[in-house]
């Protein structure tokens, strides 16, 4: 799901 991908992308740098 797009939301899951977005969450992952935002969490990667953190």
Swiss-Prot record:
Subcellular location: Mitochondrion inner membrane
A GO term from the CC aspect: proton-transporting ATP synthase complex
Highest taxon, organism lineage: Eukaryota
Keyword Transport belongs to the record: yes
Cysteines engaged in disulfide bonds, as pairs: none
Annotated keywords: ATP synthesis, CF(0), Hydrogen ion transport, Ion transport, Membrane, Mitochondrion, Mitochondrion inner membrane, Transmembrane, Transport
Membrane-topology descriptor: Multi-pass membrane protein
Keyword Mitochondrion found: yes
GO biological process: ATP biosynthetic process; proton transmembrane transport
Recorded coiled-coil stretches: none
Similarity comment: family membership: Belongs to the ATPase A chain family.
Oligomeric and partner information: F-type ATPases have 2 components, CF(1) - the catalytic core - and CF(0) - the membrane proton channel. CF(1) has five subunits: alpha(3), beta(3), gamma(1), delta(1), epsilon(1). CF(0) has three main subunits: a, b and c.
Function: Mitochondrial membrane ATP synthase (F(1)F(0) ATP synthase or Complex V) produces ATP from ADP in the presence of a proton gradient across the membrane which is generated by electron transport complexes of the respiratory chain. F-type ATPases consist of two structural domains, F(1) - containing the extramembraneous catalytic core and F(0) - containing the membrane proton channel, linked together by a central stalk and a peripheral stalk. During catalysis, ATP synthesis in the catalytic domain of F(1) is coupled via a rotary mechanism of the central stalk subunits to proton translocation.
Protein name: ATP synthase subunit a
Organism: Spinacia oleracea (Spinach)
């Amino acid at each position: 799901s797009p939301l899951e991908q977005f969450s992952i992308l935002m969490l990667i740098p953190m």
